[in-house]
Every structure is written in structure tokens, then in C-alpha cells.
């Protein structure tokens, strides 16, 4: 029988917990990013091939993963600079014109909405049940290549944003999981003590270790990384690389979000 926790709030991870990604969607977003960057760079008089941009984007993956593992953040513009510098062999091509930079940034983040991850099929019902039982509901997300404002818009489009009392995105607060302070920020925004919160996520380091360091209860959503993500240098596979080598233990494990209700009073 599952242990039951007396909590007043539940927080969710975004990627591979609330929203599910696929290698096909991930590749499509990367294609759209490179196409958009190439088109906008051409308008600025910078000739760079799609292939060189794609190589730059691939090279950025381990760089980003190493930074994010430490809970640090890289802005959209910094990511673009890295990719373009690699693609152009470090020629300084990004101008300071705000409108031009805004167009470059939009071409980079907009694929999060044009080729979006899919809402977990169990999420709407579970969120509704939590709301009916007066639990506070929060989201704690490491944003990756898609910024918080884009992911929040995706939640709105899928009809789940209004269930949340707080949505915390790492690019907006300036730090990410597994840092303790992003979980403490969530608790403060929900008006609860960390000990009153159950955090649900798929990453043993980012979600379980991080939430436990703040004093939260944890459920590990046991979602297997699709083989396609392991066959290419994806951020998902790289951030999960240490999961099998950890001594961290969650308070419970689930294979479906609907199981959350079995753990809370």
C-alpha cells in the first residue's frame, strides 16, 4: 500500500511530466529554429548555411546541459550567439539593433508553439481533481530552448494554465532545478511551507534531489527516455545521464499522473 502524505499543495515538472516530448517533435523544432535563424540572418546580410547552423545547434546541446545541471541559466540570446558564432567560425555577426535581435529570438523560441510537446493525457483530470480538493497547484520548470512565456502560452492553449496558482520558469527567476531556491520560490508563491508540498517530476536529480533539499515530499514519475532521444545528443538524454548512478530515493514512484491521488490525504 502506498504511503500517504498530508500536504496542501502539489507542484509539477513540465517536461516529460506535464507535457511529453518525442524525438520527432524535438527534431522538427530544431529544423524550424535553424530555418528561422537562417532567414533572419540573411535579412541582416549574413550568409550562413542551414547545415552550419544545425551543426552549431548540435554543438550547443552538451554546452547547455552542463550549464543547466548546475542550476545556472542561459538566455535565448546567449544561446543564439553560441550557435551563430559556431556556425560562422566566430565571426561577430549579431548586431545590437533591438528589432533585429527580437526577430532572431522569436525564430528561436516560436517552434515551442508551432511544433509543441503534447499534454500528458492524464493531466486535465488530475488537475481538476486536485482543484476540487482545494490543493494549491504549482509548476516548476527548467525552460531549455523554449522560454517561460512560450511554455505558459502552450499551457493556456491546452486549457490547463488556469489550474495553476503559480508557474515558475527558470529563465524568468534566473536559476533552475536542482537548486534549492527554485523550490523555495515555488513554496513562497503558493503561500505554503515546503513540507506541505508534494513535488512530481521525472528527473531523479533535478526533481527529487532538488525538491528534497528544500524539504518537500517527492514522487518520481517513471518515464523512460525514448530511444530516439538516446541516439542523438538531446538535452533530455544528457540531463538524465546520471539518474542510474544516484543514491537519491524518492518518497514514492508513479507511472501515471492519476496515481498521485493515491499518495495524498
Label each region the model flagged.
Residues 4-128, 132-133, 148:
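N-terminal helical cap/lid subdomain that shapes the substrate entry/recognition surface
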Amino acid at each position: 500500500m502506498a504511503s500517504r502524505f498530508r500536504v496542501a499543495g502539489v507542484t509539477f515538472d513540465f517536461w516529460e511530466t506535464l507535457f511529453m516530448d518525442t524525438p520527432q517533435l524535438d527534431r522538427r523544432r530544431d529544423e524550424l529554429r535553424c530555418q528561422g535563424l537562417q532567414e533572419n540572418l540573411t535579412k541582416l546580410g549574413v550568409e550562413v548555411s542551414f547545415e552550419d547552423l544545425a551543426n552549431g545547434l548540435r554543438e550547443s546541446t552538451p554546452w547547455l546541459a552542463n550549464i543547466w545541471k548546475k542550476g545556472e541559466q542561459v538566455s535565448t540570446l546567449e544561446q543564439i550567439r553560441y550557435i551563430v558564432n559556431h556556425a560562422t567560425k566566430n565571426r561577430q555577426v549579431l548586431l545590437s539593433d533591438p528589432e533585429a535581435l527580437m526577430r532572431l529570438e522569436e525564430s528561436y523560441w516560436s517552434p515551442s508553439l508551432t511544433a509543441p510537446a503534447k499534454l500528458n493525457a492524464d493531466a486535465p483530470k488530475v488537475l481538476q481533481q486536485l482543484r476540487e480538493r482545494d490543493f494549491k497547484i504549482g509548476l516548476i520548470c527548467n525552460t531549455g530552448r523554449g522560454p517561460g512565456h512560450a511554455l505558459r502560452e502552450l499551457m493556456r492553449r491546452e486549457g490547463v494554465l488556469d489550474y495553476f496558482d503559480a508557474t515558475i520558469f527558470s529563465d524568468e527567476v534566473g536559476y533552475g532545478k536542482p537548486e534549492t531556491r527554485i523550490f523555495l520560490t515555488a513554496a513562497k508563491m503558493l503561500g505554503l511551507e515546503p513540507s506541505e508540498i508534494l513535488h512530481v517530476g521525472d528527473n531523479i536529480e533535478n526533481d527529487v534531489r532538488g525538491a528534497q533539499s528544500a524539504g518537500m515530499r517527492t514522487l518520481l514519475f517513471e518515464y523512460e527516455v525514448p530511444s530516439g532521444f538516446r541516439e542523438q545528443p538531446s538535452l533530455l538524454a544528457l540531463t538524465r545521464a546520471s539518474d542510474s548512478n544516484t543514491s537519491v530515493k524518492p518518497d514514492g514512484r508513479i507511472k501515471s499522473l492519476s496515481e498521485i491521488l493515491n499518495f495524498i490525504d
